[in-house]
Amino acid sequence: MSKKGDSSDHLRCSFCGKNQDEVKKLIAGPAVYICDECIELCNEIIAEETEKGAVDSEFQDIPSPKEIKAMLDEYVIEQDHAKKVLSVAVYNHYKRLDTAFDSKDVDIQKSNVLLIGPTGSGKTLLAQTLARFLDVPFTIADATALTEAGYVGEDVENIILSLLQNADYDVERAKRGIVYIDEIDKIARKSDNPSITRDVSGEGVQQALLKIVEGTTASVPPKGGRKHPQQDFVKVDTSNILFICGGAFNGLAELIQRRQGEKVMGFGAKVQTKTDMKIGDLLVQTRPEDLLKFGLIPEFVGRLPVIATLGELGEESLVRILTEPKNALVKQFQKLFEMEGVKLRFTDSALSAIAKGALDRKSGARGLRAIVEKAMLDIQYEIPSMENVKECVIGEEVVMHGEDPILLFEPSKKKA
């Protein structure tokens, strides 16, 4: 009950001692009183403790590197080295955030990651799977769409805006999110000599990205954007955001081979040609100096201390990708057909044909879905209207030449 109107002089807040005339409200309890100011202070203390407890709980639940890799194994085939490197880097990153809350005596640097590998080798999938497993906000940006501020194109701050949107405008969650920047190799400068002219989509973009990658306070439009120009911009500290950059880096293997060739010159030196070594074996030996020669600026290379390389995927690997992961294409289509009461089966030769098609397109795992969708289009159109179909068998001819699949009907209802 409120005692604001009570004229008794002895009514005071039991916590701060102020009398009823010095506060807005005085709430009475059994032999005690509390004022509105003390209530507000108590609410602030409780909110701070609750937030700190939630953060502490979040960091105590960080999975170990082995647990992270085991989860990645469920969705990404092969690439064990990259998965191990990424697992350790992500674990250390979130432990670093934990340390930031508990200790101020050691400054642990952020472990941003550079993923190097051919198109369709699993770079984007690794980043997506990590973010989903860790339950943190995640966004993907295309480096080729970015330009320096003042030029037509996407500003680098838009990356943080996208992350904030995916965090439902929860700034604290966004500050612990993961950003994946794809096609990072496409913003390399044209030579390893500093440019004296404007490079709107190359060196200039690297300089712009450098600020948010190393840690800055980015100003992004509020919810509603330009519809509410009177609103203040939202400030997001990027110091604790994990940045994962990925690219195919075509031509990097040749730079590495050239560097190695210079060091093995002389009598009796064993020289390995490009045919002797796979591109993946060369990329594993990537050094910062190779990235500098490729066209990344020194400051940007320095902000990506962890390098993980992914190898090329062969036919056998692509077949495994079609069938083994939790989100495997074959499993997805089998589930869709199961909903129609039909068992779907792909022959081994059909799976090999799909894998070979992706290899011919030089698109890696990324090209698998387009090939499968094309092969399955007609039968997906027909099956819902057909009766008594028990099983559908997809053979090599369906994939290669668009022939009809084999349909097996219920024996008792099979028509002559």
From Swiss-Prot:
Question: Which superkingdom heads the taxonomic lineage of this protein's source?
Answer: Bacteria
* Binding-site list for Zn(2+): 13, 16, 35, 38
Return the PROSITE patterns for the record.
CLPX_ZB
Q: Can you cite an annotated GO cellular component?
A: HslUV protease complex
tRNA processing listed as a keyword: no
Among SUPFAM superfamilies, the record links this protein to: Glucocorticoid receptor-like (DNA-binding domain) (SSF57716), P-loop containing nucleoside triphosphate hydrolases (SSF52540)
Annotated positions binding ATP: 118-125
- One GO-annotated biological process of the protein: cell division
Secretion signal, residue range per the UniProt entry: none
Keyword entries, A-Z: ATP-binding, Chaperone, Metal-binding, Nucleotide-binding, Zinc
| Limits of the ClpX-type ZB domain | 1-54
User: What's an example of a GO molecular-function annotation for this chain?
Assistant: unfolded protein binding
Q: Which SMART domains match?
A: AAA (SM00382), ClpB_D2-small (SM01086), zf-C4_ClpX (SM00994)
Q: Looking at the Swiss-Prot or TrEMBL record, what is one Pfam family this protein matches?
A: zf-C4_ClpX
How would you summarize the oligomeric state and partners of this protein? Component of the ClpX-ClpP complex. Forms a hexameric ring that, in the presence of ATP, binds to fourteen ClpP subunits assembled into a disk-like structure with a central cavity, resembling the structure of eukaryotic proteasomes.
* Function statement: ATP-dependent specificity component of the Clp protease. It directs the protease to specific substrates. Can perform chaperone functions in the absence of ClpP.
Q: Which family does it belong to?
A: Belongs to the ClpX chaperone family.
Q: What is this protein called?
A: ATP-dependent Clp protease ATP-binding subunit ClpX
Where does this protein come from, organism-wise?
Desulfatibacillum aliphaticivorans
Record lineage = Bacteria, Pseudomonadati, Thermodesulfobacteriota, Desulfobacteria, Desulfobacterales
